[in-house]
């Protein structure tokens, strides 16, 4: 309503908040415009920053208009019926249903890892879906948005066969690189990714095997979810070196040099919490336990290695400010504005 102008740096104080309260409560402002997003990316580029979007192409939410299990769009004007609602839905082929006699409101569809809130997308039976997603891949790395790449959620799970998975990512890479040759394609992946890192699919990966896991065991003796503590792994240089040599050998040099090297992220306990060697999760231990008996000096040592190891050192927001937390959702706490741990 005010023109969609970005906040200036000097407007970050609380006394300016009332000027913008209508922006986030007015119905017309609930969804930012594409034009504002393009402006945001342009400003970030001007400041020497780059923007990578999170692409979740393996599944969608059950509330997505394509499925509409929660029946949000069923009676809204301008929306076609979701695949859950009707067998005649234009999105029916986007999903794999297993009982053809349950419409309307058919709950028998494939969900990612069995989660009915995360319907798995059925590319093999829907050229329309594949074409749409490939257009999306190119759209956001192209003018006027000029995003700098994609982070691909559970990328190896996409499709219902490995053959199709590799075929799709080859098409995805072609679409992205033709639109923006400098855009990076970064995949979330656990295990050996060499089959995708041959120059025709992904550029690199979130580096669990050749960074996060070996460092976590060496510095803390903890599994990355804080689900297990192995004292024999703490400070075990032989295990650390052997693991690094083994997993780094599966990378070609360009992928290794750009791999996303994290100590913490949104799926695992905070590294600082792992330094207390406390096994468990927030629902059993409580959130306060995550910050008990921590060892910041251990994290500082790990950060030195993170910043000097081959790859792209990647900070998870709040790690630099001493944020603690057990695994998801406790690891997604609010940033401690004004209360950062400066040490």
Q: Could you say what each language-model-derived stretch is?
A:
Residues 1-144, 172, 178, 195, ...:
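Substrate-binding/active-site clefts of carbohydrate-active enzymes
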Residues 63, 68, 169, 173-174, ...:
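Conserved alpha/beta catalytic core and glycan-binding cleft of carbohydrate-active enzymes
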Residues 118, 136-143, 147-176, 192-213:
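Conserved N-terminal glycine/acidic-rich loop preference
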Residues 246, 337-343:
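Aromatic- and carboxylate-lined catalytic core of secreted/periplasmic carbohydrate-active enzymes
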Residues 49, 146-148, 183:
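The start of beta-strands in P-loop NTPase/AAA+ ATPase cores
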Residues 35-39, 61, 127, 131-134, ...:
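A structural signal for well-ordered alpha-helical segments within the folded catalytic domains
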Residues 52, 151-153, 186:
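Conserved beta-strand positions in the central sheet of alpha/beta enzyme cores
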Residues 1-35, 114-130, 153-164, 225-238, ...:
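The substrate-binding groove and active-site-proximal loops of carbohydrate-active enzymes
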């Amino acid at each position: 309503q005010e023109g969609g102008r970005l906040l200036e740096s000097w407007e970050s104080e609380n006394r300016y908040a009332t000027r913008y309260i209508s922006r986030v409560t007015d119905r017309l402002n609930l969804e930012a415009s594409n034009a504002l997003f393009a402006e945001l990316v342009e400003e970030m580029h001007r400041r020497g920053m780059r923007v990578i979007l999170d692409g979740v192409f393996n599944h969608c939410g059950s509330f997505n208009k394509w499925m509409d299990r929660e029946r949000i769009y069923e009676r809204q004007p301008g929306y076609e019926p979701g695949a859950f609602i009707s067998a005649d839905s234009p999105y029916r082929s986007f999903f794999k249903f297993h009982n053809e006699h349950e419409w309307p409101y058919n709950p028998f569809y494939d969900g990612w890892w069995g989660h009915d809130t995360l319907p798995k997308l059925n590319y093999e039976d829907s050229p329309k879906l594949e074409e749409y997603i490939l257009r999306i891949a190119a759209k956001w790395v192209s003018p006027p948005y000029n995003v700098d790449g994609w982070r691909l959620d559970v990328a190896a799970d996409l499709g219902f066969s490995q053959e199709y998975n590799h075929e799709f990512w080859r098409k995805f890479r072609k679409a992205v690189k033709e639109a923006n040759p400098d855009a990076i394609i970064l995949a979330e992946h656990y295990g050996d990714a060499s089959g995708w890192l041959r120059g025709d699919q992904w550029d690199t990966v979130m580096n669990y095997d050749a960074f996060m896991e070996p460092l976590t065991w060496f510095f803390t003796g903890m599994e990355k979810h804080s689900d297990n503590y192995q004292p024999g792994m703490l400070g075990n240089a032989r295990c650390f070196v052997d693991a690094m040599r083994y997993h780094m050998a599966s990378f070609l040099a360009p992928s290794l040099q750009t791999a996303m090297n994290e100590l913490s992220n949104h799926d695992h306990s905070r590294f600082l919490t792992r330094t207390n060697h406390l096994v468990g999760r927030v629902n059993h231990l409580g959130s306060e336990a995550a910050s008990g008996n921590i060892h910041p000096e251990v994290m500082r040592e790990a950060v030195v290695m993170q910043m000097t190891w081959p790859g792209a050192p990647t900070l998870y927001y709040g790690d630099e400010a001493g944020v603690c937390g057990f695994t998801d959702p406790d690891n997604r706490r609010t940033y401690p504005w004004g209360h950062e741990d400066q040490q």
